[in-house]
Each structure stands twice: as C-alpha cells, then as structure tokens.
Design a protein with these regions (language model features):
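Short alpha-helix
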Residues: 138-155
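A conserved beta-strand element that flanks and buttresses the S-adenosyl-L-methionine
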Residues: 90
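Conserved beta-strand signature within the Rossmann-like core of class I S-adenosyl-L-methionine
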Residues: 114-121
Length: 205
C-alpha cells in the first residue's frame, strides 16, 4: 500500500495516533465512522484484526484491499455486531453527525470488550470554529456537551484533551513548527477550554 497523502496530512494523523495508542487494548479493532479509511490503516498494524464501518462506502477503501482491513457500510447508532466483538473501538469526528450521539456511544460500548476511544474536535477552538463550524457547517460539541454525551453512556470514562492540527504549508519546517506549537499549547492551562481535541477513554468493567 502506498500512502499518497501530503506529508502535512500524514503528520497530523500520526500525531493523533500517538495520542490514542497508549489506550489500545487487545487484538481486535473497530474504527467506527471510518470515513476514507486512512485512520484505520494507521491503526491496523497494532491489532491482529481490524474492521472499519461507515454509513457510506468510500472509493478510497479500494486502496486498502490488500491490507487485511475489512470495510463495511453500517450505521454506528445500530452496529451489526454481537456484544463484545472487538477489544478496542475507536471513533474520530463521526459522533457530531449522529442523530442520537448517546445511542452511538452506547452502541460502541456494547460491541467493545475492553476499551472505547472517542475523539471529537472542540467546537470552540478558534480555528476549528471558523473552518469547520462556520464555513463547513459541522456541529461539533462544546467540551461540556461532549462530557454530557459520554457520561450518559453509563460506562466508566476519563476525559483527555490534546492539540493537533494540519500544517497550512506542506513543508518539513512548517510541519515541525506546528507540532512544536501544539506541544507547547498542551502545557498552557488557559488554552485548555479551546484546545483542538476532546478525547474520552471508556473502559468496560
């Protein structure tokens, strides 16, 4: 498989992978709301079995047909899997599209045997609000609403937050500069309310 994505996009995805990797559990993964499949492909080497599901098929899935990843269409509010089918379930930026996000979280918890990792962009990050909410029409959650949705699942959880963004210029210098800035922003307490990503790690008892 050849990854033809620009280096700045790859760096952004890899940074997010480094943030969630410590919470991976077991041998099997479900990427819920996988989109183009690029994130599933990054996570797959850490598991013996990887499946990925999205409401609509992406033409990009064909790129990964020889990787062993199983792609399926399906609704994450009603996943077509038995209880505890996967050790780890990961979701990134799908939940705000769900008609009932609480039901979607409960479904991910139902099909997980160990861990659910949920990532959603912070609605009130200044750059994300301009680019994703005002211009893109995405209704991302505030930190308060995100926590309410996670808590309503009834599964024990921890809330984490981190900084990650795509470098606006595809150059090694700018990519490094953006990543260094993200490292710095994570250490500044007053940046917390507008930091780029909210993450929940839900652990099955």
């Amino acid at each position: 498989m050849t990854n033809n994505a620009p280096e700045n996009a790859q760096s952004y995805r890899k940074r997010i992978l480094e943030k969630i990797k410590p919470y991976f559990s077991g041998d099997s993964l479900l990427d819920a709301g996988c989109g183009d499949g690029e994130d599933a492909a990054l996570m797959a080497p850490f598991f013996k079995k990887t499946e990925a599901v999205d409401l609509e098929e992406s033409v990009n899935w064909k790129k990964f047909e020889n990787t062993g990843i199983i792609f399926k269409t399906g609704n994450c509010e009603k996943l077509n899997y038995p209880v505890g089918s996967f050790d780890t379930v990961v979701e990134k930026d799908m939940l705000h599209h769900a008609s009932d996000p609480v039901s979607a979280v409960k479904e991910m918890c139902r099909v997980s045997a160990k861990t659910v990792i949920i990532l959603e962009a912070n609605r009130y990050n200044p750059i994300f609000y301009l680019h994703l909410t005002l211009m893109g029409g995405h209704q991302h959650f505030s930190q308060k609403r995100f926590k309410e949705i996670i808590a309503a699942s009834g599964t024990p959880y921890e809330i984490k937050r981190f900084s990650a963004r795509v470098s606006p210029v595809n150059s090694a210098f700018m990519i490094k500069l953006v990543n260094n800035a993200s490292d710095l922003l994570e250490k500044i307490p007053f940046y917390g309310p507008v930091i780029e990503y909210n993450m929940a790690v839900l652990t099955k008892k």
